[in-house]
């Protein structure tokens, strides 16, 4: 053994060839943390000191290569002054440089995934051989930063600036064949031949058949582009990427600027440019929010995994109610491998559901994400039925009938008598109390809510609602099934609107107040889209459906009359009464035309102003900042109440629910992190400025206490 640590070992393989193996003890994956970096330095020193070493193969002792840097250490590191961050990155890069500068050839054998620092380690090697099943990429832009261990320096010099910009700015994982095509790897082999492939490359380099020094040299030099080529490549890329990323996500464009600035430098000076830009991004609020989201997502996954121990295996599912929603649920279950019965009382609804599933599967085939054979397999896994004949062996039933408590109670009671005693019943309701629906059941312990968001195939969130009598097994089984469907489940307790809709309707309430105060809804949409929402509140209402919003508003007003009941007519009332229901019937706040792709396109329709005129009670002058606060303050305060009321267990789950469920701007991190970014005391003072607008704007006593004590939701 040449070197042995807790994360890295170096040992002889054969005739002067050594293996530098990453295998971080006590962890399921390899990652770059302080320990790993320190051991890499020691391992490289040990290799350099051993005259018998003729070549080095870098590989992993786990199912994946290296997943990147340890994000938990980012939180502490990014609090350091900018100069210390730069120094830390340069120190890490000296370790990578020392490996790259070894006097012997090096080969990285890539299995599983090599992301971020994992790929940057591979780029420091002379050659890379990749398993056919492996994936590589530099996803740092998704955290509001860019690669900091040499990725913006080595990758452009290896695969060309255009390809490197595409890889870095997109932050996607890349398949082996794509990596080989652009020259990011030198060979692709079957997983079982990975070590043999690496040995073949290293032996050819040792023998002189391959010139490893010539292979290494371009990574040490400036980019091979003249001034005109640089201007064309970088300026065009910056314009395109800025348009794609938008103004709230600076990292992709900053990565291009770093590559451009370092283009005429050799490796060491170029790495200094990279480190300086990395440190600047690391200190932004965007990076703080996106890293916070990543950590929150990891927390969600840990909590969901904790349910696995007692969850029952779902081998056969069923959905009650076909149509678009039922078809979407059936598609998601089938395409992820769980066969599902789709029942309705009407043949036309069954056909609508099957058509929806078939359309979604067809779209995946067209995009190359599914083979025709797999499409046929998924379609065969959806069994339409008009009866309960095959329900005896169903493990979970998702009820997705009309949003009416009496109808849902009747259907749930009926199906309960058709399934085995331990089958789970789950209602896909968006607002109706789970405790109320449970009253119709003989086995309420087997009943939960399972709230999918529309469209099912696109929205990542599923709210799993625990009723007063829901058993831990019922909750755990539903969480496990949601995960199996490829969704991110969050467990919430029962209340009107649960988490997401309870928080969303105060936001809509703020919007209604603005319209009643004479503020142009088109202006409101523009302001909130600029704030970061994927669509403004008027457009969102049209997409959701004015009738759906009207019904949901009434449910919330009944549940929380002290702050959500408004005696005055609102914009939603006026549109509902005028039968302007949004996209579904072509007119809501906006009118809708069909574009060339057959998609609805919104256009301004002046006739809506006459519909809204009776509900405008004043003409108040408001700034864009006022518009944001009228809407965001009640949303944030209701999120605080959900946490305080125990509807959601943690701040992480609350924020992720809003990001995944309603498109809360990710770069702002979620409602509670948004409060943190303002400062709890400052947010309370801000809310107090709008106290005259009603109880939705009144901070809770506990939040005032947090403000007084200087507390935050996230440390």
Curated annotation (Swiss-Prot):
The keyword Heme does not apply. The gene is fadB. This is Fatty acid oxidation complex subunit alpha. Its EC number is 4.2.1.17, 5.1.2.3, 5.3.3.8, 1.1.1.35. The record marks 120, 140 as: Important for catalytic activity. It catalyses: a (3S)-3-hydroxyacyl-CoA + NAD(+) = a 3-oxoacyl-CoA + NADH + H(+); a (3S)-3-hydroxyacyl-CoA = a (2E)-enoyl-CoA + H2O; a 4-saturated-(3S)-3-hydroxyacyl-CoA = a (3E)-enoyl-CoA + H2O; (3S)-3-hydroxybutanoyl-CoA = (3R)-3-hydroxybutanoyl-CoA. It comes from Pseudomonas putida (strain ATCC 47054 / DSM 6125 / CFBP 8728 / NCIMB 11950 / KT2440). GO terms for cellular component: fatty acid beta-oxidation multienzyme complex. GO terms for biological process: fatty acid beta-oxidation. Pfam families: 3HCDH (PF00725), 3HCDH_N (PF02737), ECH_1 (PF00378). In the N-terminal section; belongs to the enoyl-CoA hydratase/isomerase family. In the C-terminal section; belongs to the 3-hydroxyacyl-CoA dehydrogenase family. PANTHER family: TRIFUNCTIONAL ENZYME SUBUNIT ALPHA, TRIFUNCTIONAL ENZYME SUBUNIT ALPHA, MITOCHONDRIAL. The active site is at residue 451. Residues 1-190 are annotated as: Enoyl-CoA hydratase/isomerase. Pathway: Lipid metabolism; fatty acid beta-oxidation.
């Amino acid at each position: 053994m040449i070197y042995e640590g807790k994360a890295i070992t170096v040992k002889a393989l054969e005739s002067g060839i050594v293996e530098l193996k990453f295998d971080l003890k006590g962890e399921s994956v390899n990652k770059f943390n302080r320990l790993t970096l320190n051991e890499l330095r020691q391992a490289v020193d040990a290799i350099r000191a051993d005259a018998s070493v003729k070549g080095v193969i870098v590989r992993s002792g786990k199912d994946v290569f290296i997943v990147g840097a340890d994000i938990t250490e980012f939180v502490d590191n990014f609090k350091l002054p900018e100069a210390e961050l730069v120094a830390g990155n340069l120190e890490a890069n000296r370790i990578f440089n020392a490996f790259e500068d070894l006097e012997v050839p090096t080969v990285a054998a890539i299995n599983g995934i090599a992301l971020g620092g994992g790929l940057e380690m591979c780029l420091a090697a002379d050659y890379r051989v990749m398993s056919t099943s492996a994936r590589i990429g530099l996803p740092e832009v998704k955290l509001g930063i860019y690669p900091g261990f040499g990725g913006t320096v080595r990758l452009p010099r290896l695969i060309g600036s255009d390809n490197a910009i595409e890889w870095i700015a997109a932050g996607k994982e890349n398949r082996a064949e794509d990596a080989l095509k652009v020259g990011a790897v030198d060979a692709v082999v079957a997983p079982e031949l990975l070590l043999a492939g690496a040995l073949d490359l290293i032996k050819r380099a040792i023998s002189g058949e391959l010139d490893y020094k010539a292979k290494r040299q371009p990574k040490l030099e400036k980019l091979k582009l003249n001034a005109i080529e640089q201007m064309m490549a970088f300026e065009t890329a910056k314009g395109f990427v800025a348009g794609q990323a938008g103004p709230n996500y600076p990292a992709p464009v900053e990565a291009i600027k770093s590559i451009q600035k370092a283009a005429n430098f050799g490796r060491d000076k170029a790495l200094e440019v990279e480190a300086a830009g990395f440190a600047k991004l690391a200190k932004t609020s965007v990076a703080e929010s996106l890293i916070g989201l990543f950590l929150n997502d990891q927390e969600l996954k840990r909590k969901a995994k904790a349910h696995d121990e007692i969850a029952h295996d779902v081998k056969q599912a069923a959905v009650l109610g076909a149509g678009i929603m039922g078809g979407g649920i059936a598609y998601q279950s089938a395409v992820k491998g769980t066969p599902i019965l789709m029942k309705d009382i009407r043949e036309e609804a069954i056909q609508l559901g099957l058509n929806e599933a078939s359309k979604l599967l067809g779209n995946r085939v067209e995009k190359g994400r599914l083979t025709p054979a797999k499409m046929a397999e998924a379609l065969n896994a959806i069994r339409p039925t008009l009866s309960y004949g095959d329900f005896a062996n169903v493990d979970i039933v998702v009820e997705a009938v009309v949003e009416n408590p009496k109808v849902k109670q009747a259907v749930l009671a009926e199906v309960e008598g058709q399934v085995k005693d331990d089958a789970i019943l789950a209602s896909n309701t968006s607002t109706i109390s789970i405790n109320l629906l449970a009253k119709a059941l003989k086995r309420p312990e087997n009943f939960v809510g399972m709230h999918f968001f529309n469209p099912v195939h696109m929205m990542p969130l599923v709210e799993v609602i625990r009723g007063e009598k829901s058993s831990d097994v019922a909750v755990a089984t539903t969480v496990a099934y949601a995960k199996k469907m490829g969704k991110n489940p969050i467990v919430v307790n029962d209340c009107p609107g649960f988490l997401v809709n309870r928080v969303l309707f105060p936001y809509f309430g703020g919007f209604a107040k603005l319209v009643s105060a004479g503020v142009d809804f088109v202006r409101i949409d523009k302001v909130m889209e600029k704030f970061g929402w994927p669509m403004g509140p008027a457009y969102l209402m049209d997409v959701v459906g004015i009738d759906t919003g009207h019904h949901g508003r009434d449910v919330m007003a009944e549940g929380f009359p002290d702050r959500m009941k408004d005696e005055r007519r609102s914009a939603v009332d006026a549109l509902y009464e005028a039968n302007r229901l949004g996209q579904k019937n072509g007119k809501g706040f906006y009118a809708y035309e069909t574009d060339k792709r057959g998609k609805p396109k919104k256009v301004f329709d002046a006739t809506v102003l006459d519909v809204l005129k009776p509900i405008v009670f004043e003409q108040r002058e408001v700034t864009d900042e006022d518009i944001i606060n009228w809407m965001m303050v009640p949303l944030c305060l209701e999120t605080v109440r959900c946490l305080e009321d125990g509807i959601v267990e943690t701040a992480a789950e609350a924020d992720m629910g809003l990001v995944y469920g309603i498109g809360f701007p990710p770069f702002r991190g979620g409602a509670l992190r948004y409060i943190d970014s303002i400062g709890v005391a400052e947010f309370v003072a801000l809310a107090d400025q709008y106290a005259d607008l009603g109880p939705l704007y009144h901070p809770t006593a506990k939040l005032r206490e947090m403000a007084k004590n200087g507390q935050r939701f996230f440390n």
